[in-house]
């Protein structure tokens, strides 16, 4: 009898050890899998499952104290509520469901602690490095935009590069080791060069503005250093602009504008003008609570036939419309002013979370990047990039807790619920 009790009691620590190993592996795996279209969704479900096995749901009351966690829950609840006054589509691409991918932040953050942090960082860096190498090959050797083998568009790849640039600049400023600092600045230049060779104008502008804000905030008290870095950054950007054919793309923008003035909207910029116009018209129709979750996907093609005498009626042949190429118009179409407030609260909470952990400078730069990117595309629907940002945020939070000697969330069998 005594032997059975001893044997049973020894099983619990052993089970917890295996559970910890499983959590480490999943954190490592997720950082790599989030870039793979055929694995990212499954990886998210695996993270959630391991979180439940790790009794993460018992720590939800602690995790929800982070402003970003609360904001994500509010946004997803608002979208779910919006189905009640929307006409749920029987068919369609249902891209709005991608907003719910934000929820993966909760189990990922809850699984992290000081012991598991290196595994999460390893997965994050490994995944980024693998995708970056494939992307550089596609850009420099194959002459392709984006990363076709991984089904990553040039906009997603450009956004990924932009985030890497901002993080590299910040880490270079924080590092006290000359070799590491030099390596990070070299990485920044490499990423910037590749980004200038991508056709994504919006992510590039967001990167330059976000990086500029970061440099200003980081070195504003060191005027000579600030001026030196700013001059070097501008010279580098101009040099890369020439080599990357940016001026040809700017000339294309002017051509698109001229064609739009002639009533020809079947161009990249002209199509966006049309989508924004119809989207703003849709918001004006139902300004308070929008058309309901899911309805805007089919709204464009129905409306263009008669709107403004049908000047956009041929655009469905040019491109199938499933979103409005602007975060604010997109959420406004779904949920109106209510949705706009919720989305603004999300961005504010993202910054507040990073600020609370002494990361206000990179927080301001990243939120600036998200905001600017969302003006020309539905950045919030770029699942891979947004998930990548959330993983960075989670890692940064736990890293800061570790450095400041703060406790992370307790991993006990008995939780608060």
Where are these regions (language model features)?
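Transmembrane signal-anchor hairpin modules in multi-pass inner-membrane enzymes, especially those
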Residues: 1-84, 91, 110-122, 171-182, ...
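Alpha-helical transmembrane segments of multi-pass inner-membrane proteins
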Residues: 48, 112-143, 152-219, 241-242, ...
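Hydrophobic transmembrane alpha-helices and their immediate junctions
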Residues: 225, 333-368
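A membrane-periplasm/extracellular boundary helix in multi-pass inner-membrane enzymes
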Residues: 197, 218-262, 277-285, 293
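Transmembrane alpha-helices of multi-pass inner-membrane enzymes
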Residues: 48-49, 343, 363-375, 379-417
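Long extracytoplasmic/lumenal interhelical loops at the membrane interface
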Residues: 264-270, 274-277, 285, 289-335
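Aromatic-anchored transmembrane helix interface
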Residues: 68-76, 89-112, 128, 151-163
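Perimembrane helix-loop-helix junctions
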Residues: 52-60, 207-229
